[in-house]
Amino acid sequence: MLLYQYSLKITIAFYCLILLIFLKEGIKLSKVLGIIAEYNPFHNGHLYHFESSKKLTKTDYTVAIISGNFTQRGSTSIIDKWSKTKMTLENGIDLVIELPVLYSISSAENFADGAIKILNSLGIIDYLSFGSETSDIDILKNISEILYNEPNGYKKLLKKELDKGLSFPKARENALLGYIKNSSNDIKFDIGKYTNIISSPNNILGIEYLKALKKYQSNIKPICIERTGTNYNSTDISTKNSFANDSIINKLTAIGSATAIRELIKLKNYETIKDLVPSSSYSILIDCLNDGCIVPDLNVFEKEIFYILRKMAVEEIANLPDVSEGLEFSIKKAANSYNNIDDFLNIVKSKRYTVTRLQRILLYALLDISKKDIELSKRIEKPYVRILGFNENGKKLVSQIALNHPEITLITSVKKFVDSNSNKDLQIMFAKDVFATDVYSLGFENNSLGNLDFKNGIIKYKK
């Protein structure tokens, strides 16, 4: 009898161990895809990218890190982060995580660096897929290697280009082209091809993702899906007839850039939008329109921005990220001379300071973000993981992350995090997210209330 009881205990212990291993490793028997996006809003091109990525990688689960209420190019998200989360989940993604605002409105380098830090910390991601204007990821990898290693020849060319008074992106583009051409053994070196690659917004972000993956010695495997239809900033629309036969594209009516869709929303051309977004995205967009919760662009906050800039001392403007070399004086003068953002941008922009950089500076002023804040975001090795929403599969992923990586700061309850977290750097970073939402909601026509981060819980999607 004693022998039987002893054997039974051993058997139970064995199966408990097997169960624990399964709980810890079960999802890792499957493959997980990671996507970094703005989804502003989620449209047919995004659906094409997602479904193509799943098909190529044969993954079972998908995690998306999305920007919140403001974007990397220094503007507003046209709909709030919870509505974007609903769109994302409705279209098949399992888990949605917010990219903190200190990353999401930063330079392409810091945007990518922050997103990769979060993805890598999860410990469950097998693939990262990003959209690009080329299908040749090897070229992007080669460019990222140059930017990561910064060989002397490249650094000399970069300094030379910056000394011409060019903006950093343009100077870097020219330096890269010069370095690649000088280093190439190909007598038929196609400078036009490389120029198009280096100057395209999605390629630039893709290169930064690759650089960050190398920086953090990540095991995540990158893939790129060539963009279909219109370019990133294009306001044109492409019908499915514009493409070669593709089983995914043939399910879609038309593909237009997020820029085109946002312009159509401003023009109230809702019938055209219907063809450019999945039906679920369209329904959510219409709900936001009816609720008065569309925030089309930074012009919504025009008066607030000019009030802040006029109130700020020149020294305070100089402390805004991306402000250097006396730009603060031009900003202060223009803020007192104009009351229109478009006029302001036109007068201050130069070959050194691009419109996108200036828009980000305006956003930094609006959201009270300083150079010190951006440096803090770079210093944080493991940012918090703010869960915006999940489906049943996504819920399993969250449990898997919590079980395997208890050191990660998972935010599933904002109040609990604010009340209990003792990491000062994470507190400062999260306070910026909360304030950004409070400012964003002032752009609503109706119900422009504060504290939405505390009032809106996790979006739990069920089919």
Model-derived segments and their meaning:
Residues I27-K84:
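N-terminal catalytic cores of NTP/NDP-binding nucleotidyl/phosphoryl-transfer enzymes
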Residues T57-T59, I93, I124-I125:
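Short, high-confidence coil segments that cap the C-terminus of an alpha-helix
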Residues K86, E90-P100:
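A glycine-rich helix N-cap at a beta->alpha junction
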Residues S7-K28:
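Short, Lys/Arg-enriched N-terminal segments with co-localized hydrophobic residues
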Residues M1-S7, I12, D60:
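Short terminal hydrophobic/aromatic SLiMs and anchors at protein ends
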Residues K54-K55, L89, I116, N120-S121:
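Non-catalytic positions within long, well-ordered alpha-helices that form the structural scaffold/packing
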Residues G26, L99-K463:
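Active-site cores that bind ATP or allylic diphosphates and position pyrophosphate for catalysis
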